[in-house]
A protein has these predicted regions:
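Phosphate-binding and adjacent anionic-ligand microenvironments
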Residues: 298-471, 476-504
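Proline/glycine-rich low-complexity loops and linkers
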Residues: 90-91, 95, 146-176, 274-354, ...
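An N-terminal, well-structured beta->alpha segment
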Residues: 1-76, 82-83, 159-196
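Buried hydrophobic positions in well-ordered alpha/beta secondary-structure cores of metabolic enzymes
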Residues: 14, 61, 98, 113, ...
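Gly/Ser/Thr-enriched, mixed-charge loops and adjacent short helices
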Residues: 123-252
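Short glycine-centered, acidic/aromatic-flanked micro-motifs in structured strand/loop junctions
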Residues: 61-65, 198-200, 274, 362, ...
Length: 504
């Protein structure tokens, strides 16, 4: 039995931890031993799930550019191979590619692991898990970690049965998807005449330029930070990061590009920039993909996370004729709800978070930033042939209001229990004040549409941290200030909830 506390590594539906020293006060807890034990436990979980013995299983391992990726991949492979399972080294890969390794005829793995911590700093790392059903659920990770806790590390000097260039297969798949969308072939250079710049943030997305855009004829001059570098020396590879977005905005405008694309480290998220330098993020990225899909899925339902704005609902429902289901935070929650709707016969082609996680029904419900980019580029090429700009797709999306997020720290020991109590009282106070509470699946949402204010607020409980985020959007600064004033009144008097950020 391991002395490590592996349960502390769980982060929702994956594993996250500190993999190397280098940041003061942060000590390593995602060790080689932990990866070894988790690898073994994953095999035991797969045996039950697949109905196969360990020596019949084939498992792929990929990694992102992080400096601890290779050693953790090796440690996990040692654990997996010790059970008799065959381990394939996919090297530098992307999270979506590792799921597709289960789908592709050339691989058909029974399961796969991706060593990544997404956009987190260089000292962090983690593990994402896949089987034929997609990414594992919270309960699956919990089971795997509990099993791993009772195992002992196993060594194997040659754990990999073979090396496989998965990224090239995955890139070919994406390239052919563009050709199919445009009814063209690679030799016809269907992206000729388009200028597209890419910011890979020194993560894993550099292949998108060399293996997809250039072979299809696009001009990619001005693309930046394409070389994988696990220290991420230029900016955080995160489409939600202000510095990262400023970098791709600048590159797009300076190089007179038709479109700018930015990806996170492991390429399961993306965002875009129009030729004007306008960023397409949060509400607008969801609006854009909804507009692309609307002609093929009229009247369908778009599933989003809880912090999307009323302007998005207006655009989806009034301008596109779609339905908007505003669900919960957490990309797995949003994707699972989309899958559930389709299984019930309610057509839902897209599940997307404001973070840039987006999954299409027609792409295995996989949150794949590169696949979304492929859809966007295909639409850009079609629009260009008709002398249209891609931004015309969301020209009727109302302008963004004045947004703010306040994070209230919970001082109670049992923060979830206390947070739920706060939400109950908050809702009760809102009802007493005769405020408008629309249908909602997470926290308490209030809409304001009167002479006092135009906008909305959402108070919710963080999924993992002792924090209650309060999101507010007002149509104008005056509206936002009025909503903040109302929020102050509604959250007053909770002794173990620190709301002082509202006073700043």
């Amino acid at each position: 039995m391991s002395e490590l506390n592996l349960m502390k590594l769980q982060n929702g539906s994956d594993v996250r931890g500190i993999a190397i020293e280098g940041v003061e006060g942060e000590h390593v807890n995602l060790t080689d031993e932990a990866a070894n034990l988790i690898g073994q436990a994953f095999v035991l979980w797969l045996e039950k799930k697949c109905g196969k013995k360990a020596n019949e299983l084939k498992i792929g391992i990929g990694r992102d550019a992080r400096i601890t990726g290779e050693k953790l991949a090796l440690a996990a492979a040692e654990g997996i191979s010790s059970t008799g399972a065959k381990v394939v080294n996919c090297g530098l890969a992307t999270t979506p590619a590792m799921f597709m390794s289960i789908v592709f005829d050339q691989t058909k793995f029974d399961g796969s692991l991706m060593i990544t911590a997404s956009h987190l700093p260089f000292n962090r790392n983690g593990i994402k898990f896949f089987n034929v059903d997609g990414g594992l659920e919270h309960e699956d990770i919990e089971e795997i970690l509990k099993t791993a806790q009772n195992l002992t590390p196993q060594k194997n000097s040659s754990p990999f049965a073979e090396n496989f260039d998965l990224l090239s297969i995955y890139a070919e798949h994406l390239k052919q998807t563009i050709c199919k969308e445009l009814n063209s072939t690679e030799s016809e250079k269907p992206l000729a005449g388009l200028k597209i710049v890419v910011d890979a943030g020194n993560g894993d997305a550099g292949f998108f330029v060399d293996k997809i855009l250039i072979p299809l004829g696009a001009n990619t001059e001005g693309s930046e930070f394409l070389e994988p570098d696990g220290m991420f020396p230029n900016h955080i590879p995160n489409p939600e990061n202000k510095q990262a977005m400023q970098a791709i905005q600048k590159a797009t405008v300076q190089n007179k590009a038709d479109l700018g694309l930015i990806f996170d480290t492991d390429v399961d998220r993306m965002s875009a920039v129009f030729h004007t330098g306008e960023e397409v993020n949060r509400d607008s990225i969801i609006a854009l993909f909804s507009a692309i899909l609307a002609p093929d899925f009229p009247g369908s339902t778009i599933v989003t996370d809880s912090v999307t704005s009323d302007r998005l609902t207006f655009f989806l429902e009034k301008k596109l004729g779609l339905k908007h289901l505003r669900y919960m935070r957490g990309y797995k929650n949003v994707i699972d709800k989309c899958r559930e709707l389709n299984e019930k016969g309610i057509v839902s082609p897209l599940a997307m978070e404001t973070s840039g996680h987006g999954a299409l029904k027609d792409n295995y419900y996989l949150d794949d930033g590169a696949f979304l980019a492929v859809k966007l580029i295909s639409s850009l090429a079609k629009a260009s042939k008709e002398n249209k700009k891609i931004e015309s797709f969301i020209s009727e999306l109302p302008p963004a209001g004045i947004e703010a997020e306040y994070r209230f720290k919970i001082k109670a020991e049992n923060f979830k229990q206390y947070g739920k109590k706060v939400l109950e009282e908050f809702k009760s106070r809102a009802i007493k004040n005769k405020l408008n509470l629309p249908e909602n699946f997470e926290g308490v949402r209030i809409s304001f549409h009167d002479k006092n204010a135009e906008g909305w607020l959402l108070l919710r409980l963080s999924l993992h941290d002792p924090v209650m985020p309060l999101n507010i959007e007002g149509k104008t600064q005056k509206d936002k200030d009025a909503i903040v004033k109302t929020a102050k009144e509604l959250v007053s008097g909770f002794e173990l909830l620190d709301t002082t950020v509202l006073d700043n």
